[in-house]
Amino acid sequence: MKKTTIGFAMTGSFCTFEPVLKQVEELVKRGYDVLPILSYHAGSLDTRFMQAERLRERLLALTGHEPIDTLQKAEPIGPKRMTDLYVMSPATGNSLAKLANGIFDTPALLGAKSHLRNERPLVLAVSTNDGLGAAAQNIGKLLVWRNVYFVPFRQDDPIGKPRSLVADFTQLPKTVSAALSGVQLQPLIAACVTMDALGEQPIIH
């Protein structure tokens, strides 16, 4: 029986690459054929979190596929029906803004557009310091799009970065499974833990 193929696009929230790669590995373990796609920044920038070439090597080792990293390679995703489901994880505020406003100028975004033409599910795993700021309106737009699903997300640092939102990447496989059945995994807003005003008692939100 043919495996379910997941297009897995990574954009430039570099600090989340390690937990995201763990979920790529988990999806492969669950029997999915994972096709990696990289935005220009994710695929080319060396950062203190990971070298670009190292990211490519790890994706190839995990999935058995060379990452799609050009517009020319991403364009056939829809016409050739290459993906049953498409993930963008991490999805930066910049990528969410472009997606919400019809700008598809990177391999990750063009792949998403090409995939959506077939009325197939798109899963977004948010990672942005402006999730409750400038990016909020774009998240709101995407929440009501047909065939778009979100990995549950939370404020990752409500005191230090009160506008920041990050997906609970451990929920990505469950979100994928639900989205393949046309269901949004709930609850969408994940709990977060902070300390009280005196820094003494944990508060679960």
Question: Locations of the language-model features?
Answer:
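A cross-family phosphate/adenosyl-ligand binding-site feature
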Residues: 1-122, 127-205
